[in-house]
A protein has these predicted regions:
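Solvent-exposed serine/threonine-rich low-complexity stretches and specific carbohydrate-binding patches
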Residues: 324-335, 420-426
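Short histidine-centered loop motifs in beta-beta connectors
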Residues: 141-145, 149, 182, 186-210
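Surface-exposed, short loops/turns at beta-strand junctions within beta-sandwich domains
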Residues: 347-353, 433-438
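C-terminal outer-membrane/trafficking sorting elements
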Residues: 381-390, 394-460
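Aromatic sugar-binding surface patches on proteins
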Residues: 333-346, 426-429
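Surface-exposed, glycine-biased beta-strand/turn segments
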Residues: 21-175, 209, 218, 243, ...
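Edge beta-strands of extracellular beta-sandwich domains
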Residues: 366-374, 452-458
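Short hydrophobic beta/alpha edge segments that flank linear recognition/processing sites
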Residues: 178, 207-222
Length: 460
């Protein structure tokens, strides 16, 4: 579905103490390019597989023999949620809606009579809603930050898994997907999932609304991690869950979103400007939460559906709660599917030590992130990572790539409790399977020079 292109921003540095429209040091827009999510032959095979499964499930009494003609009885919740242990305010953007213009190519119309959809010369008109991850999509995919959940209760009538999930271009590759039939006979397709992330429930099993079906990946014909959500009528016709001037049927959403659902996804602190790498390499966020007086600090904000003229007020607060600096910014571009902006600043050598706060206020919503300024010690320093931990997610043993020995290793559970500690680790492996419980763990590596680095690891 996507690969990123980034519109470079201005290369400035420094802050004005209480500036109003402060130009960013860098940033820009992120527009996922389109790719045919499912080829005609793949779609034909999927529909045949689903028909076979439905017939078998009806024979087994797991599905009704027939469904009454709509009126619609199903109401959809949003099919994506953030996994436990993560703190972004939002995790997605929308790149494409259903195409209502049957002509092709380059003849598109979404439900709002806009052009946020696509077609191609082979006759494909986009048949679903593409929901992409933002920011740092492959990083989010690798740590399984975005969970795909059942938009409505129903019965699983199809599953595909085991296909490669780091694709970067349109292709004939098969995807990983779950298909759920609802009580009114409509069917939801959840496509491009991460390999081996799918629910263990079998075809014929029931799922509740909001139940986890898998996590977002880039399997199949895809240019980056996203969910392709597609809705079908009991007779197989493509349905648009959105209602608007060019799709006048009632909305399927329990809480319909606006066409431009402008929101701030997160604010982050960086030691250097974030780097967006070429697909499928994870990005290099250069995140940090610990600084010393005199260090270079990068404050960044990440948006989806940002519109021209929408102002954000940014403020940095000192440990005593007073304002260190504040400024505002608004984009002049009509619309970005996703965007980011950052400002760089050198902290004064006399900067007060303690916990600081970076805050952004946008469209009535406040998002903030704390960072520390203080003396360098083994618990606060943040330097470029020397270690890589893989595989991640893991089922048992995690490999360490980096200098050995590690002076001390501490593993924390989601409650912040130390569940394992190892002194003077000399072998490049950690057996996390011994911890028993699946979930998100924090691995803290104390280096020989007295500094530390931390890694999040998901254990299945």
């Amino acid at each position: 579905m996507k690969n990123a292109y980034l519109t470079a921003g201005l290369l400035l540095s420094g802050f004005a103490g209480f500036a109003q429209n402060q130009a960013p040091s860098g940033g820009g827009g992120y527009q996922p390019p389109a790719a045919e999510c499912v080829s005609a032959s793949q779609r034909q095979q999927m529909e045949a597989d689903l028909a076979t499964n439905v017939a078998r499930l009806r024979q087994q009494g797991l599905l009704p023999a027939a469904h009454a003609a709509r009126p619609m009885t199903v109401s959809l919740n949003w099919p994506l949620r953030q996994a436990a242990g993560f703190d972004y305010a939002n995790i997605h953007g929308i790149s494409n809606f259903v195409d209502h213009n049957a002509a092709y190519p380059n003849a598109v119309q979404d439900y709002n009579c806009g052009t946020r959809t696509y077609d191609n010369a082979s006759g494909y008109n986009h048949a679903g809603t593409d929901i992409f991850l933002w920011p740092f999509s492959y990083n989010m995919m690798d740590r399984q930050q975005a969970e795909i959940v059942a938009a409505a209760p129903g019965v699983i009538i199809g599953k595909y898994d085991g296909n490669y999930d780091r694709n970067c271009a349109m292709s004939n590759a098969n995807w990983n997907a779950v298909y759920v039939q609802h009580t009114d006979g409509s069917v939801a397709w959840y496509g491009h999932m991460k390999t081996n992330s799918l629910t263990t429930k079998a075809i014929g099993a029931s799922v509740a609304q909001g139940e986890r079906l898998g996590t977002v990946g880039s399997s199949g014909s895809s240019t980056g991690p996203h969910l392709h959500f597609e809705l079908h009528s009991p007779t197989g016709a493509v349905l648009d869950p959105y209602s608007g001037p060019c799709s006048t049927a009632a909305s399927w959403w329990a809480s319909p979103q606006t066409y431009y659902n402008s929101a701030l996804n997160t604010v982050l602190l960086h030691r250097a400007a974030p780097v967006f790498n070429t697909c499928p390499t994870p990005d290099t966020p250069n995140e940090s939460s610990a600084y010393r007086p005199g260090d270079r600090l990068y404050t960044a904000a990440y948006y989806h559906d940002q519109l021209a003229g929408q102002s954000t007020q940014y403020t940095i607060y000192q440990p005593n709660g007073t304002v260190f600096t504040t400024w505002s910014h608004s984009s002049s571009t009509a619309h970005y599917a996703a965007s980011y902006w950052y400002w760089s600043y050198t902290l004064p050598t006399t900067a007060p030590t303690g916990t600081w706060r970076f805050q952004a206020q946008y469209l009535g919503t406040t998002v903030s992130r704390n960072f520390t300024v203080g003396v360098v010690n083994a618990t606060t320093v943040a330097r470029p990572a020397q270690y890589t931990l893989y595989p991640n997610p893991a089922t048992d043993v995690v490999q360490l790539s980096g200098p050995l020995p590690v002076a001390r290793v501490e593993v924390f559970n989601p409650l912040g409790q130390v569940v394992r500690s190892i002194d003077n680790l000399r072998q490049p492996t950690l057996n996390l399977g011994e911890l028993g419980a699946a979930g998100l763990y924090l691995v803290r590596l104390h280096r020989a020079d007295g500094t530390v680095e931390q890694h999040k690891v998901v254990l299945h």
